[in-house]
């Protein structure tokens, strides 16, 4: 499954014609050197494209509109080498519709005290020009990312790289289409939401299909295709029979293979990138999709259980944002399931009945067939494993009626044994504080979970979408958190 386009980012340098041609020539040379070095760094996940120096209203406006029209342009990086009068930027910024980064840097790292003169001062005015530019962007209330430091520094390049992934998430958000193969679980509140507002705000398209329409696609899959995929399963995963008859076990596995192929063909044909199911509405499906859904998530599809389209879209979004990341540890649909409350060993067991993505697995992955009381179907096959260790984030997008809120929590990890894929987490700053803050914020039991995305990246995405974001981390104090929720509520009510 193709995750994203071949995106690029434009590098636009601001100046003015007050300093003469020689100065402007150096501005252009310096910006080209910066672009070349950024591309050679091996840190940035996407290519940076140099653009000629922006000086006049007309050129700035034309450049930003060309960026809007270029489907491969995922954002513009701006930098003021010299002073650049900000009124020249107003029209271009007004018409610009893509992610924006303000790189507050300068070409030279060190002031040449022994040789400095007015020519050097005029030529290197980022400390001056970037403030002028920053003022107009703030006055126009345009969302942008600001990165400060010398362009050659690794930490600066890493911040640019991080923003690039967020920018791609912003761009790709409007291409996320969720297929609902069932409605929400009856009487459940948190998985509900305004699908029209989600399309207005995020660009998501959420469509429902009768479960038996997709079941027909499953039934249309031929035995040869099913057998070939089952053989792939048996060569790739460990088989845990646990006393079951091998032939009977294999038949259960074959049902999931047929579901995987049928679902994927249905999604590809109708151009969907995420899917939701519900154990209470399975129609002609023989099993609740388990192994099949896990494999689809591994291929990049989003997923939400019990009709949870918001989490399905978020899983897809976060998989997009981590595409091609070196040493990626995985992104998955997840659920807060049960607690360990032993003093000193507090934590949350995160799992779901079946559907946890194997990209987060650590060590061997096995296929098991176990009974499942929900769904009233035959015992489903599923992949089981333990998850990787290390820090991660879990996000919950909720609908508060007047706005969406993204809750972002940081976690740490260890691990027990269960008949489903699992992860065991201690939320920051501790279980009691983290859980209390989560409940106060209205967080769901389903989450979109990732080792490979930072809380800052998800917060930047939320800001670009114009929605509230709250963070639960090592600095969370309940008194302050409750006040933050109250202040946010007032802000979003007044800012309508």
Spans of model-derived segments:
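Extended hydrophobic packing segments that form well-structured cores
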Residues: 375-496
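Cap/lid and interdomain-hinge subdomains that line or gate substrate/regulatory clefts
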Residues: 46-47, 104, 109-244
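Periplasmic-binding protein-like
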Residues: 73-83, 101-103, 272-277
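Short catalytic helix/loop segments, enriched in acidic residues and glycine
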Residues: 25-41
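Short, well-structured alpha-helical segments in soluble
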Residues: 60-73, 90-92, 260-269
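C-terminal catalytic subdomain
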Residues: 300-423
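Short beta-strand segments enriched in small/hydrophobic residues
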Residues: 3-26, 175-184
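Long, internal scaffold/assembly segments composed of regular secondary structure
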Residues: 231-232, 236-324
